Curated annotation (Swiss-Prot):
GO MF terms, alphabetically ordered: chondroitin sulfate binding; growth factor activity; heparin binding
Lineage top rank: taxon: Eukaryota
Protein name: Pleiotrophin-B
SUPFAM superfamilies: Midkine
Tissue specificity as recorded in UniProt: Expressed in high levels in brain and eye. Lower levels in bone. In the tailbud embryo stage, it is expressed exclusively in the central nervous system, especially in the hind region of the brain.
Keyword hit for Secreted: yes
Subcellular location: Secreted
Gene: ptn-b
Family: Belongs to the pleiotrophin family.
Cellular component terms per the entry's GO annotation: extracellular region; extracellular space
Keyword rRNA processing: no
Keywords in alphabetical order: Antibiotic, Antimicrobial, Developmental protein, Disulfide bond, Growth factor, Heparin-binding, Mitogen, Secreted, Signal
PROSITE patterns: PTN_MK_1, PTN_MK_2
One of the GO biological process terms: positive regulation of cell population proliferation
Amino acid sequence: MHHQHGLFMLALLAFLLVMTVLGTDTGKKDKQEKKVKKSDCGDWQWSVCVPTSGDCGLGTREGTRSGKECKQTIKTQKCKIPCNWKKQFGAECKYQFQEWGDCDPETGLKTRNGNLKRALHNAECQKTVTLSKPCGKVTKPKLQESKKKKKEGKNKEKLLD
């Protein structure tokens, strides 16, 4: 009786071992097939960011890709256009700008150049761009100084209270 019970346990153990090995192999095959399907998909191509309202702030962009076995070929992504972007260059084109040049007395303008730093989402960008602005006195530092004085005055008032 013990001999039959031992053989039964041995057979059961062998069966479980075979099933475990077979289960592992089929799992690997499934994973490899999934990898093949993923590699069949093309790269995502993204449209420009379209603001929800106005010409800056939160918006969306649409992405597309090709491939026979791709489950998802179109998707929408949230994006943001900074409100201080240079509209004529596009939100996806980021430039490194030089310092402003001297004022041209004939045109009344000063200029500076920018070199392309980064093109986001496969955007087509100009390699170099030029900005111009009217010459004039810079009043912003004076405004900042007056704001500091106001803050100092408020702080003194708080200390007196």
